[in-house]
Amino acid sequence: MIVFIYIVLVFLILRFSVTVFNFLSNPKLGHYGKKFDDKVSIIISPSSVDATELIQSISCQDYKNVEVLMVGSNEELSTTAANAKGRYLLFVDSCSVIKMGLLNSLIYRAKVFNLKLVVLIPNRSLNSFQDYLLEPIPDFVLLNLLPLRLVRLLNLPWSAAAWERHVFYDAESYKRRNADSEEGEKDEKKAETLLANGMILSNKRTSVNEASKQLLSTFDRNPLTIAVYLLFLIAGPLVLILNSQLAFISLPFGLIFLTRIMISFLTKQNPLINVILHPLQMVALTGLLISGTLKKLFTSGIHSKS
């Protein structure tokens, strides 16, 4: 048992270290003063939310050399992108709003660091209790596990499927990616993942099913990885509480408290609410991952039998 407790503490300290690294390195899209005139094609993914507010925010941009393409309800995203004429492609969800300076900042970042792909993590509009319960969870998991700055610095390939609603591509790179070419695989390493820093606001109301799918994508839908993560995330602290003295328990609680504060400031969320709701969010995280994994395994079993 003592070995398991030490492993749990090491896992907790490693996650805390990643959060501290993200907090100090501040992986946000900066507001740059440079101006560009390269054509940008903004491709709007369909959803249940009307895109009027998004289109209005695009028209208010200081960047005018843009074309706006709407993906049809029965149309593939790649089909719409193939008709785009821009040098850069910005994929956004229809329930989003973009702020002034976004396009110039993205192009500056892509040119200076020779990036072919920029994954953006939007700020979230939280209104209902369900929003406060579910929406912060993906941000917590990502910023607690992945040092975002190292994605570019070490050319780390990682699955960005969970964040594919807000992506900025070099157009030629996107074509090579869809062609499954060798150059397309190399372009995947010329990528960066950044917090949108208030320049993209997502108003999407995430359902339980959608939240589960996003979390599964974060772990690349690997049941073993999910099981190990939940073992140390949930079972670990419970074992500590049941088998340790109060002075020993204060360490993990202090690290969790500081972790939630730092991630809340990074994502511009309310730190007090996230700290208070942390136990409920962890219960929700466990339920979402377990239900999503079981559903995936059950569905895979049905398909394999048929």
Give the predicted meaning of each segment.
Residues 110, 124-128, 134, 141, ...:
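Catalytic donor/gating beta->alpha subdomain of glycosyltransferases that bind UDP-sugars
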Residues 72-84, 100, 104-105:
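Glycine-rich, basic loop-to-helix element that forms the pyrophosphate-binding segment
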Residues 89:
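Short aromatic/hydrophobic "clamp" motif used to bind/position activated sugar donors
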Residues 1-34, 136, 264, 285:
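N-terminal membrane-anchoring/stem segments of glycan-assembly enzymes
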Residues 20-66, 77, 148-157, 289-305:
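N-terminal signal-anchor transmembrane helix
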Residues 81-83, 106-169, 173-175, 274-281, ...:
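Long helical/loop segments within the catalytic core of UDP-sugar-dependent glycosyltransferases
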Residues 93-109:
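Acidic donor-binding/catalytic loop of UDP-sugar-dependent glycosyltransferases
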Residues 34, 231-301:
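Membrane-embedded multi-pass helical conduit in multi-pass membrane proteins
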